[in-house]
Amino acid sequence: MEKLMAAFLALGAIVPFGVKGADADVDVSFKPGAWNSNDWVVVKGPRWDYKHGFVQKTDCIENECPDVPGDVVYKKFHSKVYSAMVHKKRGVMGQTVSSTMGFDYRMAPLIVISEKLDKSPEGEPMFGEHWEIVLYDEGLNVWHHMIKDGKPFWYKAAYLKVPFKKNTPYNVEVKVSKTRKGVKEMVVKCGGYEMGYIDNDLPDSFYAGIIGCEGRNQFYDFKIK
């Protein structure tokens, strides 16, 4: 049943992604029956030859993973469990994107923002340049992903080394804005910690969503406000 639900979520979210939704607040609970897969676009990662949706659980959704313990997922299947989707309603600079998320071993649920969606050779929605704001057991990372010479390229743009516990929901907040001097910055908050960095490549408007990867991850809600 869970696999059928995951397939439904993936298929139901494939929509014409060139049409941009209106800027508006988003407030989604991922409890059963509380959200609509048609409000989302399932997106392929440029590094992977597959595209996964999410699996509905009792009080959250999870990335697609084999039915094995969390440490086994991380150690043996970390490259096979990437699930990603973005909300059709775009966010804009000054809004806060947030999600309550967790992991059952070490990593790595995240919030993703992307100015636009590219297409895979098969015509499916795929990330080009995008930013990943990642929660894991040793802190927070911001990864800036790009396509360089036709190949995926990424680097760690910012990080904070602090401990986070497994099997514990954390609310991660991300805000892109301009400082008083007009430069763009990203501020990330989680668990009472805060970090920020300057990046003038950050988009003025963007798709925002979630990615589960490198282990079994849980997502309880998602907001753009």
Where on the chain are the PLM-derived regions?
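Positively charged n-region of N-terminal signal peptides that target proteins for export
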Residues: 1-4
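Bacterial N-terminal signal peptides
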Residues: 7-16
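Low-complexity, Ser/Thr/Pro/Gly-rich disordered linker/stalk regions
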Residues: 21-95, 135, 164, 179-180
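Secretory/extracellular carbohydrate-interaction modules
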Residues: 67-69, 73-145
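Surface-exposed coil/turn segments at beta-strand junctions on protein surfaces, enriched
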Residues: 90-92, 104, 163-167, 203
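Carbohydrate-binding surfaces in secreted/extracellular proteins
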Residues: 99, 166-197
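Short, aromatic/His-centered strand-loop micro-motif at the edge of beta-sheets
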Residues: 149-171
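Flexible glycan-contacting loops in extracellular carbohydrate-active proteins
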Residues: 196-221
